[in-house]
């Protein structure tokens, strides 16, 4: 797994910071991944989690995406996912991941807003095939967002 490019990339955005938790294969998507805790720097409370998956290929690009995140219910609606994604984009760019694929369920409006605030473009909504592991977890459709990291002014503007 390539070293994580943290030099020159402070993992702090206002009151939110990312702390590296583990580096390991993703338990569902079976690709190397960096797992971070989202921390409210004012209180040191963990407000959520975000991970960056390093693999590419049809499963990642169509169904799983390079990024997964979860925000604790008490912290939703405060921009935690947007701040964390902004920080993760710096790392993805440093690792040469471009474009960054982000997927979410079509009815997950907050996640869709996070993608759109980041400058990601909705490419399509796809049906998840029955033999896909996320189908077995109950996920039937995915919005596919593409975030081009090397387009000037498109990222880090939310």
Language model features: what each stretch is:
Residues 4-62:
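Acetyl-CoA-dependent GNAT
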Residues 6, 139-158:
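Acidic/histidine-enriched, glycine/proline-rich intrinsically disordered or flexible terminal extensions
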Residues 61-73:
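Conserved acetyl-CoA binding element of GNAT-fold acetyltransferases
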Residues 69-71, 77-90, 113-117:
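Conserved acetyl-CoA-binding loop-helix of GNAT-fold acetyltransferases
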Residues 79, 96, 108:
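Conserved G/P- and acidic residue-centered "switch" motifs that form tight phosphate/ATP-binding loops
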